[in-house]
């Protein structure tokens, strides 16, 4: 009698290529041969290319996978259709289900930070492997991290250690880097040209991580604060210069500037200001390097002119997470709304021609008020082995 282990490698590859990434771990466990094959090549690309944006999101201190199929929108022949799917992910080797406060993505790997920064580990969702990272000294609650790699594809972790005893305006920063190849931390004698707020998280692109920084200039009796872009280069282990965003707000203290990425090829920046809260502007990079950036306008939307906005939609909500679909010419914004005793995670799909669609992607656990935070979009799996 033929068993699944008797199937040819080509047939097994075709079967596994049709399985969503988030289900591969369960499927691989049914057969040692299937498990071995999937560790040497990436399956599931057909599923991803055919339909979805696969994202990871932090929701109620847990990591969730989120799949959004946007192929059904802007369909002239039939009603728009979006097929959302969100589910909690069980992380291997996290038996106690440590609550997660931060997650950083790079190259198919997720750097997970436990609440109060008590533990740090790296997770490969495709291979189902984890690696726990031991600190050089104790992790602190104000620490912030980034994940990247150098020109030799050697992965590294950047750590900002903020001095908890100083006040926020004068808080000192120390910077460490963890090298996967040597399994050790090193102290870096580097400082960025501008201030990176301790609550700021970066976006990794092509191995480097980009942050928003704040440049402070002192004019005559006036202190000006300008938001800029800053890159940490994991090859040179240095910060680049402050790069322009080309947004000129009347009052930076009341602006929302959010970073996202486009398939590990480009950066996307969303800008919104309290004074003109109904206007959402998005730009994407046409050139992006540690020392240079150029931008083009992707989309500008006046939400006051959009038809069909739901009653719960507020012009003043802060878009903390978003991604764009260049082909469909839309932006997907994430928020939450409360209906009776339940709070729902929402995705708002918006186009510059007035297109709008509201999608309920799931109930928020514990009725948390904050919307889930997007960790990465258009996830591409990795064969990077994590040896704990």
Swiss-Prot record:
Top-level lineage group: Eukaryota
Q: Cite the F-box domain residue spans from the record.
A: 1-47
User: Which is an annotated Pfam family here?
Assistant: F-box
UniProt xrefs under InterPro entries: F-box-assoc_dom_typ1 (IPR006527), F-box-assoc_interact_dom (IPR017451), F-box-like_dom_sf (IPR036047), F-box_dom (IPR001810), Gal_Oxase/kelch_b-propeller (IPR011043), SCF_F-box_component (IPR050796)
The cross-references to PROSITE patterns, in alphabetical order and at most eight, read: FBOX (PS50181)
Q: What is this protein called?
A: F-box protein At3g49510
Q: Which SUPFAM superfamilies match?
A: F-box domain, Galactose oxidase, central domain
